[in-house]
Swiss-Prot record:
It comes from the Bacteria. Couples the hydrolysis of ATP with the transport of zinc into the cell. Plays an important role in protecting cells against oxidative stress. ZosA-mediated zinc transport is required for post-transcriptional control of comK and competence development. The keyword Membrane applies. Induction: By hydrogen peroxide. Repressed by PerR. One of its GO terms (molecular function) is ATP hydrolysis activity. Its EC number is 7.2.2.20. Disruption phenotype: Disruption results in low transformability, which can be rescued by the addition of excess zinc. The chain crosses the membrane at residues 43-63, 89-109, 258-278, 286-306, 599-619. The lineage of its organism: Bacteria, Bacillati, Bacillota, Bacilli, Bacillales. InterPro entries: ATPase_P-typ_cyto_dom_N, ATPase_P-typ_P_site, ATPase_P-typ_TM_dom_sf, ATPase_P-typ_transduc_dom_A_sf, Cation_Transport_ATPase, HAD-like_sf, HAD_sf, P-typ_ATPase_IB. This is Zinc-transporting ATPase.
C-alpha cells in the first residue's frame, strides 16, 4: 500500500537535519487523517444543515484522501497496473454518488488512518537507520607533524593519524597506535558492556571512547568503514521484498481488476436475475467494492518484516533481506562450524608428547620454525607455547602448505611435517597414539602430529574451550525442533567429545573446507531448509550453499559480505532469539492473511444476503486493516 522511503545521504555531506521539518513530514499523513476525522465529526454534528454538512464531508474527502489518491494515480501511471488505493477512492466516490456522504468520508478517514499506521512502521525502520547514521561523527581531530586540527571525516584517508579524546566517538576505522581505554561498541554490536582496547587493537567508527585518550592510525577511508557497510546493509534489507510480499504485490493488480469487473457485473445482473431495484443493485455494488478491497491482505507482510528487521538491527543482528527471515523461520537444521563458532576460537596447547629418540627442545624448535610462517589459529597457539618454553626464532624458511591438512618444510637438512594424521600417515599416527597418547584424543583435544623424515617425532594436543552459552543454545534450538550439526576438520573422537559437551545432535568430522559445501547439500536433502553458522571467512562457500548463511562476524568486513545474517556480537543466544522471532513473524503473516481473507469473505456474504449496510462494511473492512498492521508491529519489541 505504501512505497517505502529510505533515508540516504551523500557520505561526504554532514548529518544536519531540521527536526521540526522532518517530524512534520513524517506525521503529515496522520495529521491529514485526524483533520479528516474532525471534519467528519463536524459534518455529523451539523447534519441538520445539509449543504454545510456535505461541504464538510467533501473537505474530509479531499484532505484525507489526497495523499492516497496521488499515490495510487502515480503508481498506476508508472507501473501500468491497478492498485488498492484507486479501488478505495472509487468506492468512496461511489458512496457519495448514492448519497452516503458520511460513509464515504469515514471510509477515506479510516483508510488514511491505516495508511498512516503503515507509514509509521516504515518510518520507524528508517528512523532506526537514521539514529544509527547520527552516531557517525562529522569531524575528526587530525594530527599532522605533532599538531592537531579539526577536519571533516570525509577528508580522512588510510594512514592518517587521529586523536580520540575521552567521551568522543571514534571518527574512523583504525588501529590504536598509543593509549588504552574502554569502548562502548553498542552502536555496532548491541552489547552495552564496554570493551577494553589497547595499543594494536582495532577500533570502529561510531563507537564511544569511555575514558583514555587514543592516537589511532586510520586504516580505511570514511566511505569504506564498517559503519558505512552496516548502513548500506540495513538499507538493502529495508528495500528488499520477500517472495510472499512479491506475490501479494503481483496478486494485488489482478485482484483489483477482478473486483472492478465484478462491480460492473453487479451493477446490472442482480436487477435482472434477482429482481433487485436499481437503487438496491447500485448500493450493493458499491458496498461490494468497499468490502472486497484487499487493503488488509496487502498490509499483511511488509509491516511485520520491517518491524523484525528494525528489531534485529537494534540488537546486533543484521539481516540482508526479509526473505532470509522467512527462511530462518522454517529452518529444520542449523549446521555450525566448530572453531570460533561452537568454540571460542582461541585454542591453546595443553600437552605435548615426544617419541623415543627425540627431545622436546628439538621438536619445538623445528615446529616453531615452521609454524611461524603460518597464520592458522593452531599454528599461532603452538608458536605461543614454544615461545613460553624459551624457543627463539631460527630465521625464515620456505614452507609448503596443504590446505586443511598440514605444513611441510626442510629444517636443518631434515624434512619435517606438521599436521593431521592423514598428512603424516594414518597407520603411523594411530600406532603412536595407541602407544603414547591414547588418553588425549578421548578428551576432545585437537591433535597436531610432528614427523621428521620417516619417523613420528611427537604430537601436540590443543584444546579450544566451547562458548559458555553453547550448550544452553543447543538445548533451546532442540526445544524449538531444530536439529544441530557440527562441521569440523578434527578427528572423529575429538569432534564427538566437543559435540557431546555442547549437546549437538549430529557431527561431521574430518571435513575439509571444500567438503563443507557437499555436506550442506547433503543435509539439505535430509532435513530441508538449512542454516549455516560460521566465521564468514574460510567457510564462505558453505554459508552461500545454505538457505541462510549466518556469520559470527565480530564486526568483520568479510562476514558482512559473505553472509545473509551477521551476529555483530559473537553471542549465539541472539541466534536463538532471531529464530524465535522469525517463526513468530511467519505465524503473524499467516494470521494476517487468513484473517484478512476471512473478513473479506464474511463481508461479501453479508452484503449479498442484504444483511449489512455500508457503514458496517466500512468499519469491518478498514478495521481489519488496522488490526493486521498492529499485529505486525508486535515484532518491534
Amino acid at each position: 500500500m505504501n512505497e517505502q522511503v529510505i533515508v540516504q545521504r551523500d557520505p561526504h555531506e554532514p548529518l544536519k537535519t531540521d527536526k521540526r521539518e522532518k517530524n512534520w513530514a513524517q506525521h503529515a499523513e496522520l495529521i491529514a487523517a485526524l483533520v479528516s476525522g474532525a471534519l467528519i465529526l463536524a459534518g455529523w454534528l451539523l447534519s441538520g444543515y445539509q449543504v454545510l454538512s456535505i461541504i464538510l464531508f467533501l473537505l474530509a474527502f479531499v484532505i484525507g484522501g489526497f495523499a492516497k489518491a496521488k499515490e495510487g494515480i502515480e503508481e498506476t501511471l508508472e507501473s501500468k497496473t491497478l492498485n488498492v488505493e484507486l479501488l478505495m477512492i472509487f468506492a468512496a466516490i461511489g458512496s457519495a454518488l448514492i448519497g452516503y456522504w458520511a460513509e464515504g468520508a469515514i471510509l477515506i478517514f479510516i483508510f488514511s488512518l491505516s495508511g498512516a499506521l503503515e507509514t509509521y512502521t516504515m518510518n520507524k525502520s528508517s528512523r532506526d537507520l537514521t539514529s544509527l547514521m547520527q552516531l557517525e561523527p562529522e569531524e575528526a581531530t587530525l594530527m599532522v607533524n605533532g599538531e592537531t586540527k579539526r577536519v571533516p571525516v570525509s577528508d580522512l584517508q588510510a594512514g592518517d593519524m587521529i586523536v580520540i579524546k575521552p567521551g568522543e566517538r571514534v571518527a574512523a576505522d583504525g588501529i590504536i597506535e598509543s593509549g588504552s581505554t574502554s569502548l562502548d561498541e553498542s552502536a555496532l554490536t548491541g552489547e552495552s558492556m564496554p570493551v577494553e582496547k589497547n595499543t594494536g587493537d582495532t577500533v570502529f567508527t561510531g563507537t564511544v571512547n569511555r575514558n583514555g585518550s587514543l592516537t589511532v592510525r586510520v586504516t580505511k577511508a570514511n566511505e569504506d568503514s564498517l559503519f558505512r557497510k552496516i548502513i548500506k546493509l540495513v538499507e538493502s534489507a529495508q528495500n528488499s521484498v520477500s517472495p510472499a510480499q512479491a506475490f501479494i504485490e503481483r496478486f494485488e493488480n489482478a485482484y483489483v481488476k477482478g473486483v472492478l469487473i465484478a462491480v460492473a457485473l453487479l451493477l446490472f445482473v442482480p436487477h435482472f436475475a434477482l429482481g433487485w431495484s436499481w437503487s438496491e443493485t447500485f448500493y450493493r455494488a458499491m458496498v461490494f467494492m468497499v468490502v472486497a478491497s484487499p487493503c488488509a491482505l496487502v498490509a499483511s507482510i511488509m509491516p511485520a518484516a520491517l518491524s523484525l528487521i528494525s528489531n534485529g538491527a537494534r540488537n546486533g543482528m543484521l539481516v540482508k533481506g526479509s526473505v532470509f527471515l522467512e527462511q530462518l523461520g522454517s529452518v529444520q537444521m542449523i549446521a555450525f562450524d566448530k572453531t570460533g563458532t561452537v568454540t571460542k576460537g582461541q585454542p591453546a596447547v595443553e600437552t605435548i608428547r615426544i617419541a623415543e629418540g627425540f627431545s622436546e627442545a628439538e621438536v619445538l624448535e623445528a615446529v616453531y620454525a615452521i609454524e611461524t610462517q603460518s597464520s592458522h589459529p593452531l599454528a599461532q597457539a603452538i608458536t605461543a607455547y614454544a615461545e613460553s618454553r624459551g624457543v627463539n626464532q631460527s630465521g625464515y624458511i620456505s614452507i609448503e602448505e596443504t590446505s586443511g591438512f598440514g605444513v611441510m618444510a626442510e629444517v636443518s637438512g631434515a624434512k619435517w611435517k606438521v599436521g593431521k594424521a592423514g598428512f603424516i600417515g594414518e597407520e603411523m599416527a594411530a600406532q603412536f597414539m595407541k602407544q603414547t597418547a591414547s588418553d588425549v584424543i578421548q578428551s576432545g583435544h585437537t591433535i597436531v602430529f610432528v614427523k621428521k623424515d620417516d619417523q613420528i617425532a611427537g604430537c601436540i594436543a590443543l584444546k579450544d574451550q566451547i562458548r559458555p552459552e553453547a550448550k544452553e543454545v543447543m538445548e533451546e534450538l532442540n526445544r524449538l525442533g531444530i536439529k544441530t550439526a557440527m562441521l569440523t576438520g578434527d578427528h572423529e573422537d575429538t569432534a564427538q567429545a566437543i559435540a557431546k559437551e555442547a549437546g549437538m545432535t549430529t557431527v561431521v568430522a574430518e571435513c575439509l573446507p571444500d567438503q563443507k559445501v557437499n555436506e550442506i547439500k547433503r543435509l539439505k536433502e535430509e532435513f530441508g531448509t538449512i542454516a549455516m553458522v560460521g566465521d564468514g571467512i574460510n567457510d564462505a562457500p558453505a554459508l552461500k550453499a545454505a538457505d541462510v548463511g549466518i556469520a559470527m562476524g565480530g564486526g568483520t568486513d568479510v562476514a558482512l559480505e559473505t553472509a545473509d545474517m551477521v551476529l555483530m556480537k559473537n553471542d549465539l543466544k541472539k541466534l536463538v532469539n532471531m529464530c524465535r522471532l522469525s517463526r513468530k513473524m511467519n505465524r503473524i503473516i499467516k494470521q494476517n492473511i487468513v484473517f484478512s481473507l476471512a473478513v473479506i469473505c464474511l463481508l461479501i456474504c453479508a452484503n449479498f444476503l442484504q444483511a449489512m449496510e455500508l457503514p458496517f462494511g466500512v468499519i469491518g473492512h478498514e478495521g481489519s486493516t488496522i488490526l493486521v498492521i498492529l499485529n505486525g508491529l508486535r515484532l518491534l519489541k
